[in-house]
């Protein structure tokens, strides 16, 4: 019998530790151990791997990660009520669960990794999911400190992450995500699997960092994407004017018709326009 079989049911853990989900923390607890195991398996073989988990709550996914064979799980939890539940799990897996009490938006796990590359696996709190992802995608140096991310989002956000040009959901987030990572939508999870049930379907996404993304000035890429998608129904010749460089110069560098709209431009086109923007600014600075 595995250690996870000896742990109490998650509903009992929630009751005993008074862990009613708090909307202010973006909490929706996933209690179905079959689904938590499926998420853990989506991160690939975990033997010898350190996993960083954000917002473990009562520890359903934490248990699955450890039972699946993770060498070590670093669990970052802001809700102090959950710490006791996590400590019970740690007692069943001596030396394999590090519990960090703090805000994931402010915590840097790299000093705890001892030079190893981790995998991030999490049912992210909805209210900080996108800012966390953007922070990880903007990590420097690159390749980053993690080798894979398996993350749960609201389905609408997940669609925006994996979208390609000409998709309705394609936008700034997709450009950044697909520039730096290979993205894949894995599976959906019904609201009924959570306590309390959210109003929307959730989706699990896998992101694997590209070893060598197309060379690009990241700040310029974000600026070009923001300008283009900020007025997504306008042609690029109009939407890019706010950047202070002739839009025709940017689109010409990418071989793009300035009459096109943002949603039709692939990531490589945004990279080319961003590099032209950065070069143009550098030349003006030197002049």
Curated annotation (Swiss-Prot):
GO terms for cellular component: cytosol. Pfam families: RrnaAD. InterPro entries: KsgA/Erm, rRNA_Ade_diMease-like_C, rRNA_Ade_Mease_Trfase_CS, rRNA_Ade_methylase_Trfase_N, rRNA_adenine_dimethylase, SAM-dependent_MTases_sf. Its EC number is 2.1.1.182. The keyword Cytoplasm applies. Keywords: Cytoplasm, Methyltransferase, RNA-binding, rRNA processing, S-adenosyl-L-methionine, Transferase. This is Ribosomal RNA small subunit methyltransferase A. It comes from Rhodopseudomonas palustris (strain TIE-1). The gene is rsmA.
